């Protein structure tokens, strides 16, 4: 049979179809020369890639790929063809094709990066990459050639073969250092992991740092610790901004609005997702300068923020994205709730951001009692906006006072109508979120009287104090940053392993705060003062499954309690030990931890009705140590979504149940 310029014939041996093609085809090598196709060489590569895998057929991959070969085909195209052929065979019945495709892709990736399968020595690689401007020069300034040789001995390049195909595609697309214009890739995954470790611990004493580098490298390269996109794609490069979450609060002035917009552009361009608190902006028709002009309302300024968010990609790694927050009692709320839907016109829609509606107990109470919610412009009701977050009793007092003041502009809406509109938009767009601001302040580690939480981040897992910027260089404002990572519960055998992993994660991320740059002074002020971290989990679904538990029947409740008690305890213990060594964070006194209040004290006690698991760890000793020595970090845990970074570990994302078998082909 003649296909694509070559003769093929087929035989059946033991029920399997074998494909044979003549070897008259010419192939074009990477250096531009041509030679006859060597099918035996291809077969050897496939044989190597299939080693140890179950239920994979090399002949099936050969059959699917050979029929796509043509005279003059490039060797790189041959490799991509067999990778695609293997990936197309991934199924529930034969899942190991994902590893066959991944190994072939790793082989191809290394040939592109190094011109050969075997990676170079680490020191030689770093010297070359620093010379090209791809790696930060500090690597060669901070470490000697002998130390690089030691680190080279830590590397196990065979760990590349543990990636799934989906993971390799994520590495190629997002995480490996590359020229994002030409697509040229400069490294493979084990260099990524060892150099992230080297960068983060570069400031540690010379006599101990290589021990931390090795331990951290082993933890991340065996998928026990999962790193977020900004760290994986950025640490080791000259662009030093690795916080995943940036929370920016806007005031009610043009200077503040413009400063907020400038801060958004700075951080979006450096890999960060954005949370914007725009709740202070006054409503449409409000007087400006005593009535000299009237206000154009929130929507034009939301459009301004949207333009800033979309003006840059996140360092070329992902598109700019933001969630914008406003209170449910804002006078314009009925116009704001519909901003994302597909009805309306361009002038009254701002569709390319997500939205967080801020609610407290009073709003729910009005709903349950069938009462009205009164809407105000924040500029017309002094003290109400701040009390909404800091003091719920004071908020209710002011709210009812302003409701009864006929001189204040207001609008009454049936609570059921307002909640119905919100839930309708939430259901139809999937991107309207809810922030219960009273709970964020009563269950946070911050004292709301000193450091209230007034917003969240892009994905709503972070709750940190902020202060409005009135100028992009305003050092009195506060931009909140959160630096993330996660424990892969599927990769650990027992909860006791979390103690060492917590030490590594806390120390690495805390060191990162000193290692990274801060394009806005208000961000550096907040990061250095609070030293906030957010360490969560991935593969929770697998953790439950391998322990024989389910989401749906309550069987997982006690295991979940044990798991997250261990996580919280070991994280706090690690931060406490670090505080003994390097000092507590400067603004530790603004946390409830300074008063000896711990998460075991503030959780909602109704949980005791459904979970009867006791506490297993020595919290009282930890409490006393924290009161004495403090914590290095104001926050330590966060349940981030980890939508793409979890794919590197071939894990389910965050705490979410799997929605179905998935693959990338």
Sequence positions of predicted segments:
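Aromatic (phenylalanine/tyrosine) cluster motif
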Residues: 7-10
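Extended catalytic cores of very large enzyme megasubunits
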Residues: 17-665
